């Protein structure tokens, strides 16, 4: 166990599950987007009038074909029902002139203290600009684990951040998490007494700060995960070595 290895362990715990969920989200986003961004066409582009013969001519419309002004929704989040609403969803936002708004809010329960998710789907201009904002307070972390990297036995987290998607492809996002009162279980290493001593000293951590950035495109994006866990582990290594040195006095 090293300071760098401990930081990598935390990255493994976060990156694997996060990337799996993001890939599912991108797939759903790409399937939905074409239905919410109807291209503007003129009658001349769609039809060629033939003199002396009947023909249907499509004139420019001042209203979209589909418009949902308001809908009440709910989602299942961590076995908890979260209520929300959807406003101004249309197939032709350039004509309607308003972005679609999706908003979910939930108060305290046994999984978290509060949750908020807000999405603005703005395809009213020449470039689509979609924004997702999330805010978690008091998220229960118990049971998060990764094979070989350890398990979080207990703790709470506050998470917030936003993701912007431009032209339905370019990603730019940043999220921050503050983990509090963490109980971390790291697998024992046979025959490595020092590593096991360090792991024991990390079983209770007061606070871990994590920053995650997302850059690139939907098909090719990078996750950059930074945290102060390396500093925490460095302190644990020093304490463990100091304890061993006292044993030789």
Each language-model region and where it sits:
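Small-residue helix/turn framework positions
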Residues: 1-12, 16-28, 40-42, 47, ...
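A generic structural signal for solvent-exposed, polar alpha-helical segments
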Residues: 32-35
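A short, compositionally biased domain-edge/stem linker segment
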Residues: 53-54
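N-terminal helix-cap/turn-to-beta initiation motif at the start of protein domains
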Residues: 59-61
């Amino acid at each position: 166990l090293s300071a760098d290895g401990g930081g990598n362990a935390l990255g493994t715990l976060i990156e694997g599950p996060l990337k799996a969920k993001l890939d599912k989200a991108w797939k759903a986003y790409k399937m939905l987007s074409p239905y919410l961004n109807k291209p503007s066409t003129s009658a001349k582009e769609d039809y060629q009038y033939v003199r002396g013969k009947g023909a249907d001519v499509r004139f420019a419309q001042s209203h979209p074909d589909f418009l949902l002004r308001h809908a009440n929704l709910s989602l299942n989040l961590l076995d908890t029902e979260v209520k929300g609403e959807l406003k101004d969803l249309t197939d032709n936002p350039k004509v309607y002139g308003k972005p679609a708004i999706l908003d979910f809010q939930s108060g305290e329960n046994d999984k978290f203290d509060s949750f908020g998710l807000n999405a603005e789907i703005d395809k009213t201009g020449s470039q689509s600009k979609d924004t997702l904002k999330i805010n978690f307070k008091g998220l229960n972390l118990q049971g998060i684990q990764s094979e070989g990297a350890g398990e979080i036995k207990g703790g709470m987290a506050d998470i917030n951040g936003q993701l912007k998607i431009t032209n339905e492809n370019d990603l730019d996002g940043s999220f921050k998490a503050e983990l509090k009162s963490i109980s971390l279980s790291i697998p024992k290493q046979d025959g490595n007494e020092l590593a096991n001593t360090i792991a024991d000293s990390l079983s209770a951590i007061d606070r871990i700060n994590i920053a995650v950035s997302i850059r690139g495109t939907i098909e090719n994006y990078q996750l950059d995960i930074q945290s102060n866990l390396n500093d925490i582990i460095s302190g644990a290594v020093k304490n463990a070595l100091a304890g061993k040195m006292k044993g030789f006095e």
